Regions:
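PLP-dependent class I/II
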Residues: 2-438
Length: 438
């Protein structure tokens, strides 16, 4: 009897354990199923959120966004100059700009100890000289090339290099309004004590040394700029980020003491964070290099190598355009896109009747060997509606985000609009602007 009872006890125990195990498995499956449903639901919500913002939208949407309720409600963000327009050119190029960097490469701080700019990759310097020769937009002979993490770091390096180190007062930094909105913030960011923002160059009247930032073509209005102050004791920094054939006629090679360039707006590779300066004075170049050394101990070699490859492909496309490998040059493609975008914008502005845009006189472009107009990377739009004083707020009410004139040192009737976003975003902007009526 005892043996039987013990056997029955084991059987009952085993049955209970099996029952508990099956219940646990069943609950786990329900939880897993619920989790999958939650993930799928979350993914759909995330996708909706993702598509709601133009700066993050997918360029490969199955249908035009303007045909969906989501597209109609979408906020068009053209406040910044993110050059995603250029994806149209680079995606079909395949592996032409692909590079492979082995794990052992680019490990040292030093790139070329024989070069004044010791952290600059020789191949990048070579391609900079080549692209300027191909385009004809800058003199490189007799210049020292300084590489920086975008032209923003190079501007700060230039201000550091050009400011008197032993003066009791900071040197004034000016630029003609409308000026690039980041100039005041960058100049006064660290309150260095050696330079300070002094505003509009057109009204600067102090009898003292100054640094004038000359942006040409200008950001935001697109006009070719020349120095405004023209007094003794002045030092010039030329920001030529937009002096490329897709934006403006290349009339002559820039021959300045200090010029700044960047791959961001020349080729569209803003994410590389690579720019360069062409500097005539060796001592100024040395001080700029010292600033970058103290600031970031040089510049990413990987970015330089990739930028060198991109510039090489651009130059190849210009020299071999019309062949089997390059049907058209990068700048021909970019110029065509910009021409069409400005045509659409001017038509939309005309239909609306509430806005106006600058007019640019044609000029001979040596690169294209033709008389061409200017088609800037940004549109400088003015709201002519009488009862609208703040154009930025007015357009925001129509789900169009721009940057208002107050950031550029002028009135709030003006806004800056990026012309460089993806095609879907730009077309939605044109459609929406055309529908605004008085």
């Amino acid at each position: 009897m005892g043996l039987v009872s013990l056997r029955n006890f084991f059987v009952l125990s085993l049955a209970l354990n099996v029952s508990l195990i099956l219940r646990a498995i069943n609950q786990n499956e329900k939880l897993h199923s619920g989790a999958l449903m939650a993930v799928e639901k979350g993914a759909k919500v995330a996708q909706m959120t993702f598509l709601s913002f133009p700066s993050l939208s997918s360029p490969s949407a199955a249908a035009p966004e303007t045909q969906t309720p989501l597209g109609r409600e979408r906020v068009v963000n053209l406040d910044h100059g993110d050059p995603t327009m250029y994806e149209q050119y680079w995606k079909p190029m395949g592996d032409k700009t692909t590079i492979v960097i082995p794990g052992w490469q680019s490990m040292s701080y030093f790139s070329d100890v024989t070069n004044l700019c010791w952290f600059m990759e020789p191949e990048f310097a070579k391609q900079i000289v080549r692209i300027h020769k191909v385009v004809g937009n800058a003199v490189t002979e007799g210049r020292h090339i300084v590489v920086g993490t975008g032209s923003s770091q190079l501007l700060l390096a230039a201000l550091y290099a050009l400011s008197p180190q032993d003066s009791s007062n900071p040197i004034s930094v000016v630029s003609a309004a409308p000026y690039y909105s980041s100039y005041p913030l960058m100049t006064d960011c660290v309150k260095s004590g050696i330079h300070k923002w002094a505003g509009d160059a057109k009204i600067f009247d102090k009898d003292e040394p100054y640094i004038e930032l000359v942006t040409s073509p200008n950001n935001p209005d697109g006009f070719v700029r020349h120095p405004m102050v023209n007094r003794t004791g002045g030092i010039l920094v030329h920001d030529l980020a937009y002096y490329w054939p897709q934006y403006t006629p290349i009339s002559t090679p820039a021959d300045n003491d200090l010029s700044l360039f960047t791959v961001s707006k020349s080729t569209g590779h803003a994410g590389l964070r690579i720019g360069w300066a062409l500097v005539k004075d060796v001592e100024v170049a040395k001080r700029m290099i010292k600033f970058i050394e103290l600031n970031t101990i040089g510049v990413s070699k990987d970015s330089q190598l990739r930028a060198a490859k991109v510039l090489e492909v651009v130059s190849d496309s210009c020299e071999q355009a019309g062949g089997s490998e390059y049907t058209e040059s990068f700048f021909h493609f970019s110029h065509t896109v910009m021409t069409e975008r400005w045509r659409l914008l001017r038509e939309a502005v005309k239909r609306s009747g509430l806005f106006s845009l600058p007019n640019f006189s044609p000029a001979h472009c040596n690169f294209f060997d033709n008389n061409l107009g200017t088609q800037p990377a940004f549109a400088w739009l003015k709201c002519d509606k009488d009862n609208v004083e703040d154009c930025e707020s007015f357009l925001r009410g129509h789900k169009i985000l721009t940057r208002g004139g107050k950031h550029f040192g002028v009135g709030s009737k003006y806004v800056r609009i990026s012309m460089l976003d993806r095609e879907q975003t730009y077309n939605l902007f044109i459609e929406r602007l055309s529908q605004i009526r008085s």
